[in-house]
Amino acid sequence: MALKTRSGNAEAARLILGLSLVVLLAACAAPEQPPTDLEEGVAPVVVAEGALSPIVITEEVKYDTDDPAIWIHPTDPSQSLIVGTDKNPEDGALYVFDLDGKIQPEKTVRPLLRVNNVDVEYGLMVGGESVDIAVGTERGANKIRVYSLPDMKEIDNGGIDVFTDEEERRPMGISLYKRQSDGTIYAIVGRKSGPAEGYLWQYKLEDDGHGNVIGVLVRQFGAYSGLNEIEAIAVDDPLGYVYYSDEGSGVRKYHADPDAEGAGEELAIFADVFGPDGFTRDNEGISIYQINDGTGYILVSDQHANKFRIYTREGEADDPHNHRFVKSVSVSTNESDGSEITSVVVNDNFPTGLFVAMSDNKTFHYYSWDDIAGDDLTKAPNGVVQE
Protein backbone atom coordinates (compact mmCIF):
# COMPACT_ATOMS: atom_id res chain seq x y z
CA MET A 1 0.00 0.00 0.00
CA ALA A 2 1.02 3.62 -0.13
CA LEU A 3 0.30 6.34 2.37
CA LYS A 4 -2.40 8.85 1.46
CA THR A 5 -2.24 12.51 2.37
CA ARG A 6 -5.19 14.42 3.72
CA SER A 7 -4.62 17.43 1.48
CA GLY A 8 -4.26 15.37 -1.67
CA ASN A 9 -0.75 16.74 -2.18
CA ALA A 10 1.57 13.76 -1.92
CA GLU A 11 4.72 13.50 0.01
CA ALA A 12 7.45 12.39 -2.39
CA ALA A 13 11.20 12.35 -2.30
CA ARG A 14 13.96 13.66 -4.52
CA LEU A 15 17.09 11.67 -5.22
CA ILE A 16 20.14 13.93 -4.88
CA LEU A 17 23.19 11.74 -4.45
CA GLY A 18 24.18 8.44 -6.08
CA LEU A 19 24.60 5.16 -4.30
CA SER A 20 27.79 4.88 -2.31
CA LEU A 21 28.78 1.62 -0.67
CA VAL A 22 30.71 3.30 2.10
CA VAL A 23 27.82 5.61 2.96
CA LEU A 24 25.38 2.74 2.75
CA LEU A 25 27.26 0.70 5.31
CA ALA A 26 27.51 3.68 7.60
CA ALA A 27 23.83 4.48 7.22
CA CYS A 28 22.85 0.94 8.09
CA ALA A 29 24.96 0.77 11.23
CA ALA A 30 23.06 -0.11 14.36
CA PRO A 31 23.72 -1.05 17.97
CA GLU A 32 24.84 -4.66 18.34
CA GLN A 33 22.04 -5.40 20.80
CA PRO A 34 18.48 -4.09 21.07
CA PRO A 35 17.27 -2.34 24.22
CA THR A 36 16.90 -4.68 27.18
CA ASP A 37 14.31 -2.63 29.07
CA LEU A 38 11.33 -3.45 26.86
CA GLU A 39 7.98 -3.25 28.58
CA GLU A 40 5.88 -6.34 29.17
CA GLY A 41 4.13 -7.46 26.00
CA VAL A 42 6.79 -6.08 23.66
CA ALA A 43 8.72 -8.77 21.83
CA PRO A 44 12.54 -8.60 21.87
CA VAL A 45 14.34 -8.30 18.57
CA VAL A 46 17.69 -9.84 17.72
CA VAL A 47 19.36 -7.30 15.48
CA ALA A 48 21.64 -8.72 12.82
CA GLU A 49 25.04 -7.13 12.34
CA GLY A 50 24.71 -4.07 10.12
CA ALA A 51 20.90 -3.97 10.29
CA LEU A 52 18.84 -0.98 11.31
CA SER A 53 17.19 -1.02 14.73
CA PRO A 54 13.58 0.10 15.04
CA ILE A 55 12.75 3.13 17.15
CA VAL A 56 9.58 1.41 18.41
CA ILE A 57 8.39 -2.20 18.50
CA THR A 58 4.67 -2.65 19.01
CA GLU A 59 3.03 -4.85 21.55
CA GLU A 60 2.33 -8.33 20.23
CA VAL A 61 -0.87 -9.22 18.42
CA LYS A 62 -2.49 -12.56 19.14
CA TYR A 63 -1.63 -14.57 16.04
CA ASP A 64 0.13 -13.39 12.87
CA THR A 65 0.90 -9.83 11.74
CA ASP A 66 0.82 -9.10 8.03
CA ASP A 67 0.21 -5.52 6.88
CA PRO A 68 0.18 -2.01 8.43
CA ALA A 69 -1.38 1.29 7.42
CA ILE A 70 -0.74 4.78 8.82
CA TRP A 71 -3.52 7.23 9.62
CA ILE A 72 -2.41 10.86 10.09
CA HIS A 73 -4.43 12.88 12.60
CA PRO A 74 -5.87 16.02 10.94
CA THR A 75 -4.73 18.54 13.57
CA ASP A 76 -2.23 16.77 15.84
CA PRO A 77 0.13 14.36 14.05
CA SER A 78 1.35 13.04 17.40
CA GLN A 79 -2.09 11.43 17.79
CA SER A 80 -1.74 9.51 14.53
CA LEU A 81 -2.47 5.78 14.52
CA ILE A 82 -1.16 2.58 13.00
CA VAL A 83 -3.71 0.01 11.84
CA GLY A 84 -2.33 -3.52 11.44
CA THR A 85 -3.75 -6.87 10.43
CA ASP A 86 -3.64 -10.05 12.51
CA LYS A 87 -4.40 -13.12 10.39
CA ASN A 88 -6.44 -15.96 11.84
CA PRO A 89 -9.19 -17.97 10.12
CA GLU A 90 -11.77 -17.36 12.86
CA ASP A 91 -10.39 -14.75 15.27
CA GLY A 92 -8.44 -12.35 13.08
CA ALA A 93 -8.35 -8.65 13.86
CA LEU A 94 -7.54 -5.14 12.79
CA TYR A 95 -5.35 -3.86 15.60
CA VAL A 96 -4.85 -0.17 16.26
CA PHE A 97 -1.61 1.10 17.82
CA ASP A 98 -0.45 4.52 18.97
CA LEU A 99 2.96 5.92 18.04
CA ASP A 100 4.49 4.27 21.11
CA GLY A 101 3.39 0.87 19.81
CA LYS A 102 0.67 0.43 22.40
CA ILE A 103 -2.48 -1.45 21.40
CA GLN A 104 -5.65 0.64 21.56
CA PRO A 105 -8.16 -2.04 22.63
CA GLU A 106 -11.23 0.20 22.28
CA LYS A 107 -10.42 0.69 18.58
CA THR A 108 -9.28 -2.84 17.72
CA VAL A 109 -11.79 -4.81 15.62
CA ARG A 110 -12.33 -8.58 16.06
CA PRO A 111 -13.28 -11.23 15.17
CA LEU A 112 -12.57 -11.11 11.45
CA LEU A 113 -12.06 -14.11 9.19
CA ARG A 114 -8.38 -13.97 8.21
CA VAL A 115 -8.10 -10.25 7.59
CA ASN A 116 -5.10 -9.97 5.31
CA ASN A 117 -4.19 -6.43 4.21
CA VAL A 118 -5.34 -2.92 5.08
CA ASP A 119 -5.11 0.62 3.73
CA VAL A 120 -6.42 4.05 4.71
CA GLU A 121 -7.86 6.97 2.78
CA TYR A 122 -9.17 10.41 3.65
CA GLY A 123 -12.45 12.15 2.95
CA LEU A 124 -15.02 9.64 1.71
CA MET A 125 -18.50 11.20 1.75
CA VAL A 126 -20.74 9.02 3.93
CA GLY A 127 -24.06 10.19 5.34
CA GLY A 128 -23.32 13.70 4.11
CA GLU A 129 -20.04 13.91 6.04
CA SER A 130 -16.39 13.55 5.08
CA VAL A 131 -15.07 10.38 6.72
CA ASP A 132 -11.56 8.93 6.88
CA ILE A 133 -11.59 5.18 6.34
CA ALA A 134 -9.60 2.00 6.93
CA VAL A 135 -10.40 -0.82 4.52
CA GLY A 136 -9.22 -4.40 5.02
CA THR A 137 -9.53 -7.62 3.04
CA GLU A 138 -11.43 -10.30 4.96
CA ARG A 139 -10.19 -13.32 3.04
CA GLY A 140 -12.29 -15.90 4.88
CA ALA A 141 -15.50 -14.06 4.00
CA ASN A 142 -14.58 -12.98 0.44
CA LYS A 143 -15.26 -9.38 1.43
CA ILE A 144 -13.57 -6.07 2.00
CA ARG A 145 -14.44 -4.33 5.30
CA VAL A 146 -14.77 -0.57 5.76
CA TYR A 147 -14.33 1.26 9.08
CA SER A 148 -14.38 4.94 9.95
CA LEU A 149 -11.29 6.54 11.44
CA PRO A 150 -10.24 7.16 14.11
CA ASP A 151 -13.07 5.36 15.95
CA MET A 152 -12.95 2.18 13.78
CA LYS A 153 -16.73 1.87 13.53
CA GLU A 154 -18.18 -0.44 10.89
CA ILE A 155 -19.75 1.51 8.01
CA ASP A 156 -20.13 -1.24 5.39
CA ASN A 157 -23.29 -3.05 6.58
CA GLY A 158 -21.37 -6.28 7.12
CA GLY A 159 -18.89 -6.03 4.27
CA ILE A 160 -18.60 -5.65 0.50
CA ASP A 161 -18.47 -8.86 -1.57
CA VAL A 162 -15.57 -8.98 -4.03
CA PHE A 163 -14.69 -11.16 -7.01
CA THR A 164 -18.30 -12.31 -7.22
CA ASP A 165 -19.06 -15.18 -9.62
CA GLU A 166 -15.36 -16.08 -9.74
CA GLU A 167 -13.93 -19.45 -8.71
CA GLU A 168 -10.83 -17.71 -7.34
CA ARG A 169 -12.32 -15.21 -4.90
CA ARG A 170 -10.18 -15.00 -1.76
CA PRO A 171 -9.07 -11.35 -1.40
CA MET A 172 -5.54 -10.57 -0.17
CA GLY A 173 -3.96 -7.27 -1.12
CA ILE A 174 -5.67 -3.89 -1.15
CA SER A 175 -4.78 -0.28 -1.81
CA LEU A 176 -7.04 2.76 -1.88
CA TYR A 177 -6.85 5.46 -4.53
CA LYS A 178 -8.28 8.98 -4.32
CA ARG A 179 -8.52 10.60 -7.74
CA GLN A 180 -7.11 14.11 -7.55
CA SER A 181 -9.49 15.61 -10.11
CA ASP A 182 -12.76 14.89 -8.29
CA GLY A 183 -11.99 13.12 -4.99
CA THR A 184 -13.52 9.80 -6.04
CA ILE A 185 -12.16 6.96 -3.89
CA TYR A 186 -11.48 3.48 -5.24
CA ALA A 187 -10.38 0.19 -3.71
CA ILE A 188 -7.97 -1.86 -5.83
CA VAL A 189 -8.15 -5.45 -4.61
CA GLY A 190 -5.99 -8.50 -5.32
CA ARG A 191 -6.61 -12.14 -4.49
CA LYS A 192 -4.83 -15.28 -3.35
CA SER A 193 -4.88 -16.72 -6.87
CA GLY A 194 -6.18 -15.51 -10.19
CA PRO A 195 -5.92 -15.41 -13.99
CA ALA A 196 -3.04 -14.26 -16.19
CA GLU A 197 -5.00 -11.07 -17.00
CA GLY A 198 -7.49 -9.22 -14.82
CA TYR A 199 -5.96 -10.33 -11.53
CA LEU A 200 -6.91 -7.05 -9.82
CA TRP A 201 -10.45 -5.70 -9.54
CA GLN A 202 -11.14 -2.02 -8.90
CA TYR A 203 -14.21 -0.82 -7.00
CA LYS A 204 -15.60 2.68 -6.62
CA LEU A 205 -16.50 3.27 -2.96
CA GLU A 206 -19.65 5.29 -2.35
CA ASP A 207 -22.57 5.82 0.03
CA ASP A 208 -25.63 3.67 -0.68
CA GLY A 209 -27.87 6.54 0.43
CA HIS A 210 -28.33 5.09 3.91
CA GLY A 211 -24.90 5.75 5.41
CA ASN A 212 -23.36 2.45 4.32
CA VAL A 213 -20.34 2.16 2.02
CA ILE A 214 -20.77 -0.02 -1.06
CA GLY A 215 -18.35 -0.98 -3.82
CA VAL A 216 -19.17 -0.66 -7.52
CA LEU A 217 -16.92 -2.67 -9.85
CA VAL A 218 -15.36 -0.39 -12.48
CA ARG A 219 -12.67 -2.55 -14.07
CA GLN A 220 -10.57 -5.72 -14.02
CA PHE A 221 -6.90 -5.34 -14.93
CA GLY A 222 -3.36 -6.44 -14.24
CA ALA A 223 -1.03 -9.11 -15.60
CA TYR A 224 0.08 -12.09 -13.51
CA SER A 225 3.12 -14.26 -14.24
CA GLY A 226 1.75 -17.34 -12.49
CA LEU A 227 5.01 -17.80 -10.59
CA ASN A 228 3.70 -17.24 -7.06
CA GLU A 229 0.96 -14.79 -6.05
CA ILE A 230 0.10 -11.11 -5.92
CA GLU A 231 -0.42 -9.53 -2.49
CA ALA A 232 1.31 -6.16 -2.07
CA ILE A 233 -0.44 -3.26 -3.82
CA ALA A 234 0.43 0.43 -3.45
CA VAL A 235 -1.13 3.51 -5.04
CA ASP A 236 0.59 6.84 -5.57
CA ASP A 237 -2.41 9.19 -5.32
CA PRO A 238 -0.88 12.44 -6.64
CA LEU A 239 0.95 10.82 -9.56
CA GLY A 240 -1.94 8.48 -10.30
CA TYR A 241 -0.12 5.15 -10.50
CA VAL A 242 -0.73 1.74 -8.95
CA TYR A 243 2.10 -0.70 -8.26
CA TYR A 244 1.82 -4.34 -7.28
CA SER A 245 4.25 -7.15 -6.53
CA ASP A 246 3.97 -10.09 -8.90
CA GLU A 247 6.06 -12.22 -6.58
CA GLY A 248 9.07 -13.79 -8.24
CA SER A 249 8.58 -11.65 -11.34
CA GLY A 250 8.76 -7.97 -10.36
CA VAL A 251 6.75 -4.87 -9.51
CA ARG A 252 4.18 -3.99 -12.19
CA LYS A 253 2.91 -0.45 -12.81
CA TYR A 254 -0.41 0.78 -14.25
CA HIS A 255 -2.52 3.92 -14.23
CA ALA A 256 -4.67 3.99 -11.09
CA ASP A 257 -7.43 6.02 -12.74
CA PRO A 258 -9.76 3.60 -14.55
CA ASP A 259 -10.68 6.40 -16.97
CA ALA A 260 -7.10 7.35 -17.88
CA GLU A 261 -5.98 6.91 -21.47
CA GLY A 262 -4.29 3.52 -21.74
CA ALA A 263 -5.48 2.55 -18.25
CA GLY A 264 -5.25 -1.15 -19.06
CA GLU A 265 -1.72 -1.02 -20.44
CA GLU A 266 1.23 -2.03 -18.29
CA LEU A 267 3.57 0.96 -17.95
CA ALA A 268 6.58 -0.79 -16.44
CA ILE A 269 7.91 -3.78 -14.59
CA PHE A 270 10.88 -3.23 -12.29
CA ALA A 271 12.39 -4.73 -9.11
CA ASP A 272 12.76 -7.77 -11.35
CA VAL A 273 16.36 -8.78 -10.64
CA PHE A 274 16.75 -11.94 -8.58
CA GLY A 275 19.76 -13.78 -7.20
CA PRO A 276 23.02 -12.41 -5.75
CA ASP A 277 22.50 -8.95 -7.28
CA GLY A 278 18.79 -8.67 -6.54
CA PHE A 279 15.95 -10.19 -4.55
CA THR A 280 16.73 -13.35 -2.64
CA ARG A 281 13.40 -14.93 -3.56
CA ASP A 282 10.19 -12.89 -3.78
CA ASN A 283 9.55 -9.17 -4.09
CA GLU A 284 6.89 -8.39 -1.48
CA GLY A 285 5.60 -5.30 0.37
CA ILE A 286 5.59 -1.90 -1.36
CA SER A 287 5.54 1.58 0.19
CA ILE A 288 6.16 5.02 -1.30
CA TYR A 289 8.06 7.90 0.34
CA GLN A 290 6.52 10.96 -1.27
CA ILE A 291 7.77 14.53 -1.50
CA ASN A 292 5.55 17.36 -2.66
CA ASP A 293 7.61 18.06 -5.79
CA GLY A 294 6.70 14.67 -7.28
CA THR A 295 9.94 12.89 -6.51
CA GLY A 296 10.58 10.17 -3.98
CA TYR A 297 11.33 6.53 -3.35
CA ILE A 298 9.56 3.21 -3.74
CA LEU A 299 10.54 0.69 -1.07
CA VAL A 300 10.10 -3.01 -1.87
CA SER A 301 10.57 -5.79 0.68
CA ASP A 302 13.18 -8.45 -0.04
CA GLN A 303 11.35 -10.61 2.48
CA HIS A 304 13.67 -13.57 2.79
CA ALA A 305 16.79 -11.42 3.09
CA ASN A 306 15.30 -9.08 5.74
CA LYS A 307 16.04 -6.12 3.50
CA PHE A 308 14.23 -3.37 1.65
CA ARG A 309 15.35 -2.44 -1.85
CA ILE A 310 14.74 1.20 -2.77
CA TYR A 311 13.93 2.67 -6.21
CA THR A 312 13.33 6.19 -7.49
CA ARG A 313 9.68 7.23 -7.47
CA GLU A 314 9.88 9.73 -10.33
CA GLY A 315 11.82 7.61 -12.80
CA GLU A 316 14.11 9.37 -15.27
CA ALA A 317 13.67 12.69 -17.08
CA ASP A 318 13.22 10.95 -20.43
CA ASP A 319 11.30 7.98 -19.02
CA PRO A 320 9.11 8.46 -15.92
CA HIS A 321 8.54 4.71 -15.80
CA ASN A 322 12.22 3.82 -15.41
CA HIS A 323 12.47 3.33 -11.65
CA ARG A 324 16.17 3.06 -10.90
CA PHE A 325 17.49 1.00 -7.99
CA VAL A 326 19.40 3.23 -5.55
CA LYS A 327 19.89 1.45 -2.25
CA SER A 328 19.34 -1.70 -0.19
CA VAL A 329 18.80 -1.47 3.57
CA SER A 330 18.99 -4.32 6.08
CA VAL A 331 16.42 -4.17 8.87
CA SER A 332 15.77 -6.10 12.05
CA THR A 333 12.26 -7.12 11.02
CA ASN A 334 12.09 -10.81 10.19
CA GLU A 335 10.39 -12.07 7.00
CA SER A 336 8.80 -8.64 6.51
CA ASP A 337 5.87 -8.53 4.12
CA GLY A 338 3.59 -5.50 4.45
CA SER A 339 4.96 -2.01 5.10
CA GLU A 340 3.96 1.66 5.01
CA ILE A 341 5.77 4.99 5.08
CA THR A 342 5.03 8.70 5.47
CA SER A 343 7.15 11.84 5.36
CA VAL A 344 4.78 13.56 7.79
CA VAL A 345 6.59 14.44 11.01
CA VAL A 346 4.42 12.62 13.54
CA ASN A 347 6.74 13.29 16.49
CA ASP A 348 10.38 13.95 17.37
CA ASN A 349 11.30 10.27 17.07
CA PHE A 350 10.70 10.46 13.33
CA PRO A 351 11.98 13.89 12.23
CA THR A 352 11.81 13.23 8.48
CA GLY A 353 9.29 10.43 8.28
CA LEU A 354 8.00 7.16 9.72
CA PHE A 355 8.40 3.71 8.16
CA VAL A 356 6.36 0.80 9.57
CA ALA A 357 7.05 -2.83 8.70
CA MET A 358 5.60 -6.09 9.95
CA SER A 359 7.79 -8.73 11.55
CA ASP A 360 6.91 -12.40 11.89
CA ASN A 361 7.16 -12.30 15.69
CA LYS A 362 3.62 -10.85 15.95
CA THR A 363 4.84 -7.25 15.97
CA PHE A 364 5.21 -4.18 13.79
CA HIS A 365 8.43 -2.14 13.80
CA TYR A 366 8.62 1.65 13.49
CA TYR A 367 11.74 3.05 11.82
CA SER A 368 12.95 6.60 11.29
CA TRP A 369 13.38 7.66 7.67
CA ASP A 370 16.55 9.41 8.88
CA ASP A 371 18.09 6.00 9.55
CA ILE A 372 16.94 4.49 6.26
CA ALA A 373 18.00 7.45 4.14
CA GLY A 374 21.36 7.93 5.80
CA ASP A 375 23.42 10.52 3.96
CA ASP A 376 22.65 9.36 0.43
CA LEU A 377 18.85 9.66 0.11
CA THR A 378 16.72 12.78 0.34
CA LYS A 379 14.96 13.66 3.59
CA ALA A 380 11.79 15.71 3.30
CA PRO A 381 9.97 16.46 6.56
CA ASN A 382 6.28 16.97 5.82
CA GLY A 383 7.03 16.41 2.16
CA VAL A 384 9.32 19.41 1.80
CA VAL A 385 13.00 19.18 0.87
CA GLN A 386 15.08 21.30 3.23
CA GLU A 387 17.49 23.80 1.66
Identify the meaning behind each predicted range.
Residues 270-284, 318-346:
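Conserved blade-ending motifs and adjacent loop-strand segments that build the rim/top face
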Residues 55-92:
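Beta-strand-rich domains and repeat architectures in extracellular enzymes and scaffolds
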Residues 24-27:
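C-terminal motif of bacterial Sec signal peptides marking the signal peptidase cleavage site
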Residues 75, 99-102, 124-125, 147-155, ...:
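Short loop/turn segments immediately following beta-strands, especially the blade-tip
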